[in-house]
């Protein structure tokens, strides 16, 4: 059986076809094609024989030498025992951590070494220095450098950190891995600017290459030799391609980097920083202090905003005046009566506004108060004052149309009407006596009307008596019976202009009516 056997493949057919096509054109194939063909055929061989087989040792499962090749051996650190209670164990661990700086694993290992004897372990803790599990800044930097060189090969990383165990390296790797994704704003901006600059450089390179053809020499450099041209019908084989080094590899624009956005470099600043070694540290300290002060301002602003937001969430309900749940009461107190009179003086007959001012009275109750207490509080004069203020003329009389519509009359007029009705019922004048001329009227004021002449009673029955006579200037006219003439009236000599319906001079008082009949015999 031959030691080497070639395996036919599709690549050999491709090589033969490419070789057959290139030989007639060039005369002889290139050496590069030959070398690629040899490498390809060498890779496609199957090696058979004892020289290419691995030596497998015999299996010895119970042999102690099976685990002798391992460098790291597991060591039992802790095994619980019923002789040590949980409270005693917690007290021992707390003392070991606070007084001697041991961690839990080291303290339990010491206790297991002394066979769960707490007194011996406490006495022996001071004789040893605990192995530090903390990572200093130098250890972290060395770990990052070693990880960049070796990757996840923790055995090689341990060679750079000999005081760290592999489990400790693995544990720190997973905690360090979580912080790698946190990039600052400056780093992200630098990456963006770097990507843009690379794109601009590539565009400039393409423009520069477009001016010079691939096979022609550069006219600016006469010493440069032209590149060898390939035949048009030549096809490259599957061999390895030569890496062509570009003449624009060391381009100045590609190697130039700019600081991130917001950072500027000035010659004065670089000179000042490089002048003395302490000046750089002082500058950085000043920048750090400014950064800390700005962070404090931001924190104080956040606290202020949060307090204002909490104040706004409460709403304006605490600031609203308390709403009194007043119940409507029909009983009028003295204060409410005085308040109602003042409200009538202010709002007139706007009973809705008056009810809102009082608070515990309805619109109907206010109207009832106005009717009931009109004479007691002289509300008509109060209304006249309010109307005078509204019209702009004090003491304006009530119009005739309003009186006909049922507007209330002034209080003095109503009192006089009552007096006239009372006197007409209680007194009687005999018909046989002719009426004497009226006495001269006393001096009257403008507010009171002139006196009336008391007429005699008619012969009609009491039920058919006429209403008492009124003055001519009154608004209410007497009702006349259908079969009886009106009673005699007297025209007043001086009528007040306020009560007269028609302005102008009036004649002296004269009797109006028919002559009186003889009186009937009294019963």
Swiss-Prot record:
Location of this chain's protein in the cell: Nucleus
Recorded hits in Pfam families, A to Z, give:
ELM2, Myb_DNA-binding, REST_helical
Q: Which UniProt keywords apply?
A: Coiled coil, Isopeptide bond, Methylation, Nucleus, Phosphoprotein, Repeat, Repressor, Transcription, Transcription regulation, Ubl conjugation
* Compositional bias annotation for Basic and acidic residues: 30-43
Residue ranges annotated as compositionally biased, kind Basic residues, are 248-260
Q: Which residues form a coiled coil?
A: 283-314
Q: Which cysteines are joined by disulfide bonds?
A: none
Q: Which segments constitute the ELM2 domain?
A: 44-129
Supply the name of the protein: REST corepressor 2
């Amino acid at each position: 059986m031959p030691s080497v056997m070639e395996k036919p493949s599709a690549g050999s057919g491709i090589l033969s076809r490419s070789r057959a096509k290139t030989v007639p054109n060039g005369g002889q194939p290139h050496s590069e094609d030959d070398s690629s063909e040899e490498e390809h055929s060498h890779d496609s061989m199957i090696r058979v024989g004892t020289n290419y087989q691995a030596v497998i040792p015999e299996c010895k499962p119970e042999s102690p030498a099976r685990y002798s090749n391992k460098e790291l051996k597991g060591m039992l650190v802790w095994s619980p025992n019923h002789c040590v209670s949980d409270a005693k164990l917690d007290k021992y661990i707390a003392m070991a951590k606070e007084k001697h700086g041991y961690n839990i694993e080291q303290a339990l290992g010491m206790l297991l070494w002394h066979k769960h004897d707490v007194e011996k372990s406490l006495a022996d803790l001071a004789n040893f220095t605990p192995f530090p599990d903390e990572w200093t800044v130098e250890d972290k930097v060395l770990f990052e450098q070693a990880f960049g060189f070796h990757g996840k090969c923790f055995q090689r990383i341990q060679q750079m950190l000999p005081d760290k165990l592999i489990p400790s390296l693995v544990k720190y790797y997973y905690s360090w891995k979580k912080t790698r994704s946190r990039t600052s704003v400056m780093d992200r901006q630098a990456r963006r600017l770097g990507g843009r600059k690379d794109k601009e450089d590539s565009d400039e390179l393409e423009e520069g290459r477009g001016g010079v053809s691939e096979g022609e020499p550069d006219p600016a450099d006469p010493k440069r030799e032209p590149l060898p041209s390939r035949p048009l019908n030549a096809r490259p084989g599957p061999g390895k391609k030569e890496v062509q080094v570009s003449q624009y590899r060391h381009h100045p624009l590609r190697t130039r980097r700019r600081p991130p956005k917001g950072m500027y470099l000035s010659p004065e600043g670089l000179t000042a920083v490089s002048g003395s070694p302490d000046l750089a540290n002082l500058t950085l300290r000043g920048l750090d202090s400014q950064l800390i002060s700005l962070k404090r301002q931001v924190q104080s602003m956040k606290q202020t905003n949060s307090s204002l937001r909490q104040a706004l969430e409460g709403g304006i309900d605490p600031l609203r005046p308390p709403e009194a749940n007043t119940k409507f009461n029909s009983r009028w107190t003295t204060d409410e009566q005085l308040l109602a009179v003042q409200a009538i003086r202010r709002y007139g007959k706007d009973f809705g506004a008056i009810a809102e001012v009082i608070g515990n009275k309805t619109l109907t109750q206010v109207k009832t108060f106005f009717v009931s207490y009109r004479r007691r509080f002289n509300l008509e004069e109060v209304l006249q004052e309010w109307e005078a203020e509204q019209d702009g003329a004090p003491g304006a009389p009530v119009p005739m149309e309003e009186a006909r519509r049922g507007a209330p009359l002034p209080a003095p007029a109503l009192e006089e009407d009552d007096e006239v009705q009372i006197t007409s019922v209680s007194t009687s004048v005999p018909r046989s006596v002719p009426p004497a001329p009226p006495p001269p009227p006393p001096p009257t004021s403008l507010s009171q009307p002139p006196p009336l002449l008391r007429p005699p009673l008619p012969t009609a029955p009491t039920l058919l008596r006429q209403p008492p006579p009124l003055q001519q200037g009154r608004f209410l006219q007497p009702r006349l019976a259908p079969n009886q003439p009106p009673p005699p009236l007297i025209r007043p000599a001086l009528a007040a202009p306020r009560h007269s319906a028609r302005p102008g001079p009036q004649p002296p008082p004269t009797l109006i009516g028919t002559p009186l009949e003889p009186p009937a015999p009294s019963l």
